[in-house]
Regions:
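Structured, active/binding-site neighborhoods that engage oxygen-rich ligands
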Residues: 1-181
Length: 181
């Protein structure tokens, strides 16, 4: 896969996220979508500001680029939560409950990174899905589904350990992987 294709995909995801920030937490049908980048919204952010979705995706990309340990990725997620790393302004304005809980579990309990996610039935939001798309790209050349699925599972469990969340990630990431081929 060419670096240009990867960059275009990343840029599209970041722009789409920034377009969506002003509409977070709004009920469908209660607003008009602007045809240009606007600010405001629940978080009162400047136009073009991306959300935790992109920030955590950038943290994962940083991790994958350096090919380092799961602990190093959790350190990056911690830096996002504590210092606003990977944000356009250097300030965190949102983080999902399950992701925040997983980071606290890692920091406070010093848990194994792939065991930090909440295993409860109620920890089944899209928090894992929102940032894991780069895994499909990173595993582009991996021909074995079992190997890919193990990786999808490990990364998902860092923030979401319920089997439903893991299965959702496997289906989502494998669909992306298939689309890339």
């Amino acid at each position: 896969m060419s670096p240009n294709r990867i960059m275009r995909m990343l840029q599209a995801a970041i722009v789409a996220d920034a377009f969506g920030v002003p509409y977070e937490f709004k009920q469908r049908g209660t607003y008009t979508v602007a045809p240009e980048m606007v600010g405001g919204g629940f978080w009162e952010q400047a136009p073009g500001t991306w959300s935790d979705d992109t920030a955590l995706t950038l943290a994962l990309l940083d991790h994958l680029t350096h090919a380092d340990s799961y602990a190093k990725l959790m350190d990056r997620l911690t830096a996002y939560m504590e210092t606003g790393a990977y944000t356009p302004t250097g300030q965190l304005f949102d983080i999902g409950n399950a992701c925040a809980k997983a980071i606290r579990t890692y920091v406070i309990e010093q848990a194994e990174p792939t065991m930090c996610g909440d295993p409860s039935e109620f920890a089944n939001g899209n928090g894992a899905l929102m940032c894991l798309a780069p895994l499909a790209v990173a595993l582009y050349a991996e021909p074995r589904f079992v190997t890919r699925a193990k990786s999808y599972r490990a990364y998902t469990q860092m923030t979401h350990r319920h089997p439903r969340a893991v299965l959702g990630s496997v289906i989502y990431l494998e669909t992306l992987w298939q689309l890339l081929h």
